[in-house]
UniProtKB/Swiss-Prot annotation:
Positions bearing carbohydrate: 39, 106
Keywords carried by this UniProt record: Antiviral defense, Cytokine, Glycoprotein, Growth regulation, Pyrrolidone carboxylic acid, Secreted, Signal
The protein's name in its UniProt record: Interferon gamma
Subcellular location(s) per record: Secreted
GO terms, biological process: adaptive immune response; defense response to virus; humoral immune response; positive regulation of biosynthetic process
InterPro entries named among the record's database cross-references: 4_helix_cytokine-like_core, Interferon_gamma
Biological function: Type II interferon produced by immune cells such as T-cells and NK cells that plays crucial roles in antimicrobial, antiviral, and antitumor responses by activating effector immune cells and enhancing antigen presentation. Primarily signals through the JAK-STAT pathway after interaction with its receptor IFNGR1 to affect gene regulation. Upon IFNG binding, IFNGR1 intracellular domain opens out to allow association of downstream signaling components JAK2, JAK1 and STAT1, leading to STAT1 activation, nuclear translocation and transcription of IFNG-regulated genes.
Protein encoded by which gene: IFNG
Species whose genome carries this gene: Bos indicus
Signal peptide, first to last residue: 1-23
Assembly information from the UniProt record: Homodimer. Interacts with IFNGR1 (via extracellular domain); this interaction promotes IFNGR1 dimerization.
Keyword Secreted: yes
Family statement: Belongs to the type II (or gamma) interferon family.
């Protein structure tokens, strides 16, 4: 389990490192700091294959990819939360978290707080379970694609109006 956390931290660093950053030099230094701390270059880290890389390859569509990325980001924030008392790597994790929020949540100031709230909701609390079930219909409706019916009707009416005036 310990090596899994190390490997995940390394993978996070690699994934974020390749996507570009405003402070790439510092970001890469923090990656190196984490790699050294977790001994991530050790051959045993690769045992069992990658955790997320293979999964991400299966998600081609950009909107679909965001779904799986949200789960991966959620995992990393939980990982960072478990390591929050480690002062040796705290600065590195803070920089990576900040960059992750910037990239994944498009720099919005409200979204990170909402995201943090969501990943901290306990699923074993009965009151939370009841609330979640109560909101399930609304959530499912939000997930459904919006109907283009109104847009089509407007377009058809506009087209008919042009034809009638010609």
């Amino acid at each position: 389990m310990k090596y899994t956390s190390y490997f995940l931290a390394l993978l996070l660093c690699v994934l974020l490192g390749f996507s570009g950053s405003y402070g790439q030099g510092q970001f890469f230094r923090e990656i190196e700091n984490l790699k050294e701390y977790f001994n991530a270059s050790s051959p045993d880290v690769a045992k069992g294959g990658p955790l997320f890389s293979e999964i991400l390859k299966n998600w081609k569509d950009e909107s679909d990819k965001k779904i799986i990325q949200s789960q991966i980001v959620s995992f990393y924030f939980k990982l960072f939360e478990n390591l929050k008392d480690n002062q040796v790597i705290q600065r590195s994790m803070d920089i990576i978290k900040q960059d992750m929020f910037q990239k994944f949540l498009n720099g919005s100031s409200e979204k990170p707080e909402d995201f943090k709230k969501l990943i901290q909701i306990p699923v074993d609390d009965l009151q939370i379970q009841r609330k979640a079930i109560n909101e399930l219909i609304k959530v499912m409706n939000d997930l459904s694609p919006k109907s283009n019916l109104r847009k089509r009707k407007r377009s058809q009416n506009l087209f008919r109006g042009r034809r009638a005036s010609m």
